[in-house]
């Protein structure tokens, strides 16, 4: 794996040592610092890394790739494209996948906040008087990070890898020094210390699991980034560099707690010698910025996938690199994240308080990923039922334990990512259902392509020389823009293309299968452009590929006709009135087809159509 990829994939999980151990002994549900508790918490944390990250995600979940792509939406699309289940079962699985994706937005708001804030707080160790500056400095760093997004990361990306490599090396060495001083801490590798801790501490021990989970919050990112860097490089880098560095640092923090319990308020920086505090604060800040950048990029990618799959309204998506197609910038998502993270930092005031809000969204997403993986392994791969049930039983027990512990923090801030998740989930389902209802209404008011061509055989309108392309949401029906144009202007161009963009349930579609041209009678063509959910439609590419199949359309001579729907509510249907009004509001504010498909504005004719839903 390239050095640049190191920061993208492992930035989130790599910065967890800043706050994970601290929250167990100095957080909302903290426990006393003593030998049994330190060994128990450390044992739970180590085995969480081994069982959740190494075994569950890197060994099993990453097997479920959608033509190389990972992530919860890719996993959901894999199930949709291969599932033979009835509609209700598919709807449940799709809804689970969508809710998991929606929860990741809540995580995307909290991760930059807690990561950068916990790094900047280190300066208080040297100069406690700088305490009042922590929040303003954190907000300034976050604001700068988001304001820089439209420039892309191509120029600074080459620095990410070396910085993260230095980060892992530094935190590993700091931990190793303390382990040498207190080698007895290595006993925590035995799992019975963790089990004994849970038994002896009863409910309080269970609640501490919510803080232990903070060490593995970046596991879902490893799966999501699989398409960019590959399964094998991620596994190797984890095994040879990241996991050893994390274990050394966590063991080192445990050793510090046993030798100097008073330092439980920030055991990470307690590992660092006094002369190295300032360099470590700078390095930690850079590492958390890189981790935040990776998560922001992931949110941009998730948003693009949601748009392509039809669950998010069309938004502006800008490409920030000519050589790397995956580097994109989504302004709406960027500003929403920016204001949310700044509000969280100002509202919670410390990384310790933010930690109470962190984790519940990720645990829920991990639970959902496990459920979706179960159906893939059972229905698509036909795994042995007994072995699969035992494996998933173990994973579900672990995930449910962490989820239950995280939910206990509901009134301490954990409500925030859940509210965000439910709100976005509602918006996604409303948009999808509204579009289906809208398409049905349009389809009922228009003609099929075959009916239209048959009508031309009976009576043709006046044909004018020229080329026209009509965008259509359904390749089998004539767009209303064409019928309205004929009704009002009484003309039809000599060459007409009915263009339909179809998003497939795969990440990418090869050029050889991307465009299908079906020649109809009377100078008409049906053009079906197929794109994957990781791709961005390109009208010029479509026309170039279509012209290779017998069309002769000139890009500078085409008139593009598109519908401009005005949605009014009132028709009786299964969709509630408030959701119809919400859908109409979303449709009014969605990016126009002209802007989304980058059509030449001087060649576009929009025809208004009123549709009642």
Swiss-Prot record:
Q: In what way does this protein cross or attach to the membrane?
A: Multi-pass membrane protein
GO CC field: plasma membrane
Compartments, record wording: Cell inner membrane
Q: Name any one Pfam family assigned in the record.
A: K_trans_C
InterPro entries associated with the record: K+_transporter, K_trans_C, K_trans_N, Kup
The reactions it catalyses are: K(+)(in) + H(+)(in) = K(+)(out) + H(+)(out)
What are the TM regions of this chain, as residue ranges? 38-58, 91-111, 128-148, 159-179, 206-226, 238-258, 270-290, 328-348, 357-377, 387-407, 410-430
Q: From the Swiss-Prot or TrEMBL record, what is one GO molecular function term? A: symporter activity
Superkingdom classification of source: Bacteria
What keywords does the record list, in alphabetical order?
Cell inner membrane, Cell membrane, Ion transport, Membrane, Potassium, Potassium transport, Symport, Transmembrane, Transmembrane helix, Transport
Q: Which family does it belong to?
A: Belongs to the HAK/KUP transporter (TC 2.A.72) family.
Q: What is this protein called?
A: Probable potassium transport system protein Kup
Which species does the entry assign this protein to?
Chlorobaculum tepidum (strain ATCC 49652 / DSM 12025 / NBRC 103806 / TLS) (Chlorobium tepidum)
What gene is behind this protein?
kup
